[in-house]
Amino acid sequence: MAQSKLDEVVSLAKRRGFVFPAGEIYGGTRSAWDYGPLGVALKDNIKREWWRSMVVTRPDVVGVDTSIILPPEVWVASGHVSVFNDPLVECLNCHKRNRADKLEESYAEKHGDKMPENGMKDIVCPNCGIRGQWTEPRDFNMMLRTHLGPVEDENSLHYLRPETAQGIFVDFKNVMTSSRSRPPFGIANMGKSFRNEITPGNFIFRTREFEQMEMEFFVTPGTDEEWHQYWIDARTRWYIDLGVKPENLRHYEHPKEKLSHYSKRTVDIEYKFGFQGSDWGELEGIANRTDYDLSAHSKHSGEDLSYFNQATGEKYVPYVIEPAAGLTRSLMCFLVDAYDVDEAPNTKGGVDKRTVLRLDPRLAPVKAAVLPLSKKPELQTVAQNLADDLRFNEWMIDYDESGAIGRRYRRQDEIGTPLCITVDFDTLEDHAVTIRERDTMAQERVALDKVADYVAARIGEKRTRVPLKPVEMGGEPWPESGVQEAGGLY
């Protein structure tokens, strides 16, 4: 049976050191993963691009790094202790537990968005294949608990944060005062979160330990809907700008009856991963959280988290627009979208299949590979010096002198390296090298003293300016994205 594209990407990721099972020599832990040399570099590049987009290039967003362990009262105030639950059902045949809502969503996707007429009685267990043999749903709280200090009792009970957002809300007043920020403005946060997922899986898509890239944007009530649409547009363009094909993205509007307890409206950016049973998976949610969080924390803490506009004399609790992205889900999306198989000429005059990751150069873990044509010392010296010179620009550079040059090209293609630089015997005479481009396989001769400039011009450090506010507030319109929603083009 032929492997799916997703299976091939997972195999490549494990084989080439993007992702390893955590604790593999001890049998591993279900859906826990370590990121190898290439994986951690790709993660860092994604985080860097997100931070540049959300903080560095904007005058209205600042950053924080909040604690994983917060006072338990934070989670009481936010509603997580009482409502951060999923409905859990158990198959009476195989005793496998699943989220009832996810089973219903998978059923609807297979049956043209039609929900099961008889509820869970129509749904087949994905583990054993038996239909309709389920227990009644029971709520399951997803927060992971821990205890601080030497005594484990109710007084020492704490939680590992299930989201980074609450750290932003409780720091709202400190950040606003210290940074002299005023609405509309945002606070961005990246870091680890933890959820006791009932059914983790689909490689790194759903795990109990994961990284988030979240931003809370505080606005004047009454302007929230315009800002919400602005951030839906902005976040969608971010994925497209980094190479994701628009036809593989869509927007999912949460039905009103399924909105989270804090949300006025939520739109997910989904990617077509090709999962078994459900093609689409959420990359990022953009929610209009209204004034729920700041009001809740004001009430429970006794601290006034409102904003007073001295110019107008108006005092209000800001509304919040939240773009919340999953880092590891974004990484998985970029890998799947970049994965391709085409043909390349071989030394025998024929063609071979080649695997290539067409990653945007800004995301590629390795920016260029330096390849001496042979292991002759005179070529090795030139190649090693060139690699060291390029690393001085803070680029990750690979040096590979093992195997035929075609095989070395293939090794770099399948990890997404944009450029391969070959040092050959002519280099000793003309002081030039051959640079091969990953996607087209076109080759160009470049003088040694021009190589750094050549690489810099091709790894995409230049960026396009983007609108900084909604059209209704004088901003430029976003270009048509081509991303689908239910009912047509977005």
Swiss-Prot record:
Keywords: Aminoacyl-tRNA synthetase, ATP-binding, Cytoplasm, Ligase, Nucleotide-binding, Protein biosynthesis. One of its GO terms (biological process) is glycyl-tRNA aminoacylation. Substrate binds at R99, E163, F210, E211, Q212, M213, E214, E322, P323, A324, A325, G326. Its EC number is 6.1.1.14. InterPro entries: aa-tRNA-synt_IIb, aa-tRNA-synth_II, aa-tRNA-synth_II/BPL/LPL, Anticodon-bd, Anticodon-bd_dom_sf, Gly-tRNA_synthase/POLG2, Gly_tRNA_ligase_bac, GlyRS-like_core. Catalyzes the attachment of glycine to tRNA(Gly). It comes from the Bacteria. The keyword Aminoacyl-tRNA synthetase applies. It comes from Bifidobacterium longum (strain NCC 2705). GO terms for cellular component: cytoplasm. SUPFAM superfamilies: Class II aaRS ABD-related, Class II aaRS and biotin synthetases. PANTHER family: DNA POLYMERASE SUBUNIT GAMMA-2, MITOCHONDRIAL, GLYCYL-TRNA SYNTHETASE/DNA POLYMERASE SUBUNIT GAMMA-2. GO terms for molecular function: ATP binding; glycine-tRNA ligase activity; protein dimerization activity. This is Glycine--tRNA ligase. HAMAP family: Gly_tRNA_synth_B (MF_00253_B). The gene is glyQS. Pfam families: HGTP_anticodon, tRNA-synt_2b. Residues 470-490 are annotated as: Disordered. NCBIfam families: glyS_dimeric, PRK04173.1. PROSITE patterns: AA_TRNA_LIGASE_II.
